């Protein structure tokens, strides 16, 4: 079953005006009720019917009337309501019974299109002021600049599309409607574009409250005039508002004196007493370096600077005097390092015990609550030893050899034999290491051969420098002058060597000229003979000592050819 509304009622602007007034009244009904309650409380307080507890009730009633933040600073005013398309109402089910409480009940479907609604109000832009209004006085800080800042705002809802399934109850006093299934869509426009997304999001979330509370109460109050006369309906509305206001007043007038203390929870009372006394228990005590006391609990933000300025630190140290004001700096920076001030160092007024106590307390504060010992950080210096390269080793070896082979001046008064033996041993060791880098085969063969050769005895010679007449400089003995080198250098000596090999069998019985053939090198194995200049280092002096060996026939050898050694 369905029917249509009369078009003439919608074409006339009277319906829109009536609906606008009703919506304005219902949107401000909650705030008007709070104002009435505040008026009754102020009137009762002026009469003196209550004690000082009423003052607390009067101040807290405004702050505690709603736990949520209220950003509205003025009444909500509905500026325009328009229905360009006539709404449609369809009755899906209807039940008429003779019960005294309800004349009829049914299920209806309401559809509305292209509706327009425009409202205006003022909001509070200072959100800090909103928090201070609802917070208790003993926890609210004192703000220097906490003035109100109101901004007018206009919100327009256009292209409203509404489809809803409702349950209708017709009673003796009015019509009650409950919305079960609601489909709502609209376009929102705000004068403050910065707040438009936030307000639109909150409005879409609050639509459920509108259809469950605001609209049913508005329709019920409007329908009460249909069933009763005008005078009686106004009187009934006034009585109802007065009864509700008096009930709320009685609730707010409730004090501790009117209640039995046994009904109060001791746990809640203990929490309240602890909360109120916490303001007086947060004392800093003495924060001097000698009388430092840690605060395990919380600390006020306004006293935090005083606390940090009196923290034990070497930068706050002023010397070893007992004056407490000397330890407190006038200006303290949290970024100051733990260093002694210049004044203490200049005046040489340093107390080692006070410095030790400060460092100990700073270390103890770094220990965690689980008694985990935190070891202090120590500076560690690690020295990495550089690995000696091969070049450095070779340099050191050559320097050691040069130091060992350095010729020292010998006095003439010393024993000539001991000096000659000493110089010979040094020369043999130095040249032996140099000659070791040659071919290993030649070295092995020459070693066994030179063991049977009589050593060459160098002769002392006077110094060439007249100024150093007391010094005797001897030429070093060298392995270059071995008989092995002489045989391989000169062709005639090589022939003599071959003749020795040919007559080896005939002279085997005498065993005089027995020379192992493998001890002498062949022509292919002959290596170039190093010259004496290759062994001479710069800034060294060498004196030449010739060989003075002669044969039995007094035939001396020439300078170019050295005679072979005798056996």
Swiss-Prot record:
Q: MF terms per GO, please? A: lipid binding
List, alphabetically, the PROSITE patterns matched.
SMP
Q: Where is the composition biased (Low complexity)?
A: 417-452
Q: Name one GO cellular component term.
A: ERMES complex
Q: Where is this region: Disordered?
A: 392-453
What start and end residues bound the annotated signal peptide? none
According to the entry, every stretch annotated as the SMP-LTD domain falls at 1-224
Q: How does it sit in the membrane?
A: Multi-pass membrane protein
Per the annotation, which location comes first and is thus the protein's main one?
mitochondrion
* Xref: InterPro entries: Mdm34 (IPR027536), SMP_LBD (IPR031468)
On the tree of life, the source organism's domain of life is Eukaryota
Query: Where does the record place Polar residues bias?
Result: 392-416
User: Which terms under GO biological process does the entry name?
Assistant: mitochondrial genome maintenance; mitochondrion-endoplasmic reticulum membrane tethering; phospholipid transport
Q: Which UniProt keywords apply?
A: Lipid transport, Lipid-binding, Membrane, Mitochondrion, Mitochondrion outer membrane, Transmembrane, Transmembrane beta strand, Transport
- What does the record note on quaternary structure? Component of the ER-mitochondria encounter structure (ERMES) or MDM complex, composed of MMM1, MDM10, MDM12 and MDM34.
- PANTHER family, per database record: MITOCHONDRIAL DISTRIBUTION AND MORPHOLOGY PROTEIN 34
State the similarity comment: Belongs to the MDM34 family.
Functional summary from the UniProt entry: Component of the ERMES/MDM complex, which serves as a molecular tether to connect the endoplasmic reticulum (ER) and mitochondria. Components of this complex are involved in the control of mitochondrial shape and protein biogenesis, and function in nonvesicular lipid trafficking between the ER and mitochondria. MDM34 is required for the interaction of the ER-resident membrane protein MMM1 and the outer mitochondrial membrane-resident beta-barrel protein MDM10.
Domain remark from Swiss-Prot or TrEMBL: Lacks alpha-helical transmembrane segments, suggesting that it resides in the membrane via beta-sheet conformations similar to those predicted for other outer membrane proteins and porin. The SMP-LTD domain is a barrel-like domain that can bind various types of glycerophospholipids in its interior and mediate their transfer between two adjacent bilayers.
- Kindly provide the name given to this protein in its UniProt entry: Mitochondrial distribution and morphology protein 34
Protein species of origin: Vanderwaltozyma polyspora (strain ATCC 22028 / DSM 70294 / BCRC 21397 / CBS 2163 / NBRC 10782 / NRRL Y-8283 / UCD 57-17) (Kluyveromyces polysporus)
């Amino acid at each position: 079953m369905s029917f249509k509304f009369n078009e003439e009622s919608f074409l006339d602007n009277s319906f829109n005006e009536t609906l606008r007034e009703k919506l304005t009244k219902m949107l401000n009904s909650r705030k008007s009720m709070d104002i009435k309650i505040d008026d009754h409380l102020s009137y009762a307080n002026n009469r003196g019917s209550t004690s000082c507890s009423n003052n607390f009730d009067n101040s807290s009633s405004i702050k505690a009337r709603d736990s949520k933040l209220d950003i509205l600073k003025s009444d909500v005013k509905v500026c325009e309501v328009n229905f360009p398309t006539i709404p449609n109402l369809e009755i899906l089910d209807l039940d008429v019974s003779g019960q005294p409480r309800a004349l009829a009940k049914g299920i209806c479907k309401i559809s509305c299109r292209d509706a327009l609604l425009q409202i205006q109000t003022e909001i509070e832009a200072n959100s800090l002021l909103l928090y201070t209004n609802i917070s208790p006085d003993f926890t609210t800080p004192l703000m220097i600049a906490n003035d109100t800042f109101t901004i007018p705002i206009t919100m327009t809802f256009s292209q409203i599309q509404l489809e809803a399934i409702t349950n209708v109850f017709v009673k003796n006093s009015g019509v009650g409607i409950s919305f079960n299934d609601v489909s709502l869509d609209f376009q929102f426009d705000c004068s403050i574009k910065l707040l438009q997304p936030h307000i639109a999001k909150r409005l879409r979330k609050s639509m459920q409250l509108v259809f469950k509370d605001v609209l049913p109460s508005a329709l019920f109050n409007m329908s009460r005039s249909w069933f009763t006369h005008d005078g009686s309906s106004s009187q009934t509305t006034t009585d109802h508002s007065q009864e509700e206001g008096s009930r709320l007043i009685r609730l707010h007038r409730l004090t501790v004196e009117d209640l039995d203390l046994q009904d109060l929870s001791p746990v809640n009372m203990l929490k309240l007493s602890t909360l109120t006394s916490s303001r007086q228990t947060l004392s800093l005590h003495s924060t001097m370096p000698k009388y430092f006391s840690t605060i395990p609990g919380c600390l006020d933000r306004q006293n935090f600077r005083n606390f940090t300025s009196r923290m034990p630190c070497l930068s706050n140290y002023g010397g070893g005097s007992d004056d407490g004001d000397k330890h407190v700096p006038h200006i303290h920076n949290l970024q100051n390092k733990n260093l002694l001030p210049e004044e203490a160092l200049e005046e040489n007024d340093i107390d080692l015990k006070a410095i030790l106590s400060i460092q100990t307390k700073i270390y103890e504060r770094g220990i965690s609550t689980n008694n985990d010992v935190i070891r202090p950080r120590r500076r560690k210096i690690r020295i990495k030893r550089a690995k000696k390269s091969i070049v450095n080793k070779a340099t050191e070896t050559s320097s050691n050899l040069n130091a060992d082979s350095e010729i020292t001046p010998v006095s003439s008064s010393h024993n000539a034999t001991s000096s000659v033996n000493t110089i010979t041993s040094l020369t043999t060791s130095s040249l032996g290491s140099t000659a070791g880098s040659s071919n290993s085969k030649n070295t092995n063969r020459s070693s066994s051969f030179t063991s049977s050769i009589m050593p060459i005895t160098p002769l002392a010679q006077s110094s060439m420098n007249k100024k150093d007449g007391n010094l005797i400089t001897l030429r070093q003995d060298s392995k270059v002058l071995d008989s092995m080198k002489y045989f391989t250098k000169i062709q005639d000596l090589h022939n003599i060597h071959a003749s020795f090999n040919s007559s080896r069998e005939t002279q085997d019985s005498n065993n005089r000229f027995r020379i192992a053939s493998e001890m002498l090198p062949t022509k292919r194995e002959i290596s170039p003979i190093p010259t004496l200049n290759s062994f001479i280092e710069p800034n060294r002096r060498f004196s030449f000592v010739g060989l003075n060996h002669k044969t039995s026939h007094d035939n001396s050898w020439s300078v170019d050819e050295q005679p072979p050694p005798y056996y």
